[in-house]
Amino acid sequence: LFGIEEKQGDEKVDMTTEDASITNSTSVMMTTVAGDENAIGYISLGSLDDTVKAVKIDGVEATVDNVSNDSYKIARPFNILTSDKESDAAKDFVNYIMSSDGQKIVEDNGYIKEAADAKAYEAADGVSGKVVVAGSSSVTPVMEKLKEAYLAVNKDAEIEVQESDSTTGMT
């Protein structure tokens, strides 16, 4: 995010110190940082709890408002990517997530909602099927809440949330 990679010749080189501990999950990061007063790590704002504290950047606290107004400089969005052959069930689930109903869940769980002007969810008739959502441990807690709420309004759908880590990337 901030100068970890440097250009050397024609390639980028990761300049992370060899003394760094690199984890593959939010919970491991939080446990590691909580147990070592000299440790620092990064997690999603929605994962922040009282076991660790957020670092001020240029004197700015990590809050939803400060991330939303771009005054807190370390932030990344959660992206929802789908296949070209997206099923009706997947489209409907994404519509739910992006609706005011879904965005309220996002906001209520300490994450940053996408749009203040999102419209209420309108259920599509006859939508059924399985949707597999794979993503970072950063997004899993809120995705589980979104899944639970969506299944309450569409009992014919099946949502499977698979947790990985941010380094896995997308295929």
Show which residues each predicted segment covers.
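Exported/periplasmic ABC-transporter solute-binding proteins
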Residues: 1-171
